[in-house]
């Protein structure tokens, strides 16, 4: 969610998505409400907890967060995206505090949030920065014992077709069938061991799953994680 130079394409993309009703991403629903052998979630802790929806896009997960009792905060790359989301949320009767920021610049004090959800967002990296800088900033604003839920792309996810390798698993996107991500930098993750190594300085109780779907020619391959802040 660090794509400053692509702000205009993102604004235009979300300006076209002005319908009131939006629907949550499946892995977010499953992580928060499911029951799985390799996932421990205290669902009794949700009500009243402060949750940051990092790079929330059209706000599709916010009705879910509202329904299960979270206090909702959202971060996006432009005030225009925030404005569009505010209109939708007001129509749905949902309260949320929305701010402009980046993955490596989150305008909140240390340990402010109890939960952070980064649905297809935290791996966007600013020019001259790195995913580790994103993770340090995300960890700064998450409370001790707070929960981080995120998706992380595999190398053979569709968006990396013909992408330019930079360094340390970072790629510059050269093609995007949706026309909004060309030129942005994303971090990929090759396996579970790499994820564990990167997250271990800041997190414990790491649960890792994955998504491998083909939506009629769009191959979506993502790691999904839940981690507890040390």
Please tell me what each predicted stretch does.
Residues 1-47, 149-172:
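Conserved class I S-adenosyl-L-methionine
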Residues 104-116:
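A short acidic, Gly/Pro-enriched loop at the edge of an enzyme's catalytic core
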Residues 126, 142-143:
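Helix-to-beta-strand junctions that scaffold the AdoMet/dcAdoMet cofactor pocket
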Residues 126-137:
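A short, conserved alpha-helix within the catalytic core of class I
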Residues 185-202:
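Short alpha-helix
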Residues 204-214:
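Conserved S-adenosyl-L-methionine
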């Amino acid at each position: 969610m660090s794509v400053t130079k692509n702000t205009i394409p993102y604004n235009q993309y979300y300006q076209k998505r002005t319908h009131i009703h939006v629907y949550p991403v499946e892995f977010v629903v499953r992580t928060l409400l499911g029951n799985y052998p390799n996932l421990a979630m205290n669902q009794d802790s949700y009500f009243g907890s402060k949750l940051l929806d990092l790079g929330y896009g059209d706000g599709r997960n916010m009705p879910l967060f509202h329904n299960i009792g979270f206090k909702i905060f959202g971060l996006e790359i432009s005030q225009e995206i925030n404005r569009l989301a505010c209109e939708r949320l007001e129509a749905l009767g949902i309260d949320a505090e929305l701010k402009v920021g980046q993955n490596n610049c989150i305008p909140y004090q240390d340990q402010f949030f109890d939960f952070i959800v980064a649905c297809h967002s935290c791996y966007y990296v600013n020019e001259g920065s790195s995913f580790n800088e994103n993770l340090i900033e995300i960890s700064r604003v998450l409370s001790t014992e707070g929960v981080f839920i995120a998706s992380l792309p595999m190398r053979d996810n569709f968006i990396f077709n013909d992408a330019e390798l930079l360094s340390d698993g970072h790629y510059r996107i050269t093609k995007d069938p949706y026309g909004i991500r060309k030129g942005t930098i994303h971090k990929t993750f090759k396996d579970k061991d790499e994820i564990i190594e990167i997250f271990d300085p800041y997190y414990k109780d790491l649960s890792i799953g994955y998504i491998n779907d083909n939506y009629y020619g769009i191959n979506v391959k993502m790691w999904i994680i839940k981690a507890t802040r040390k």
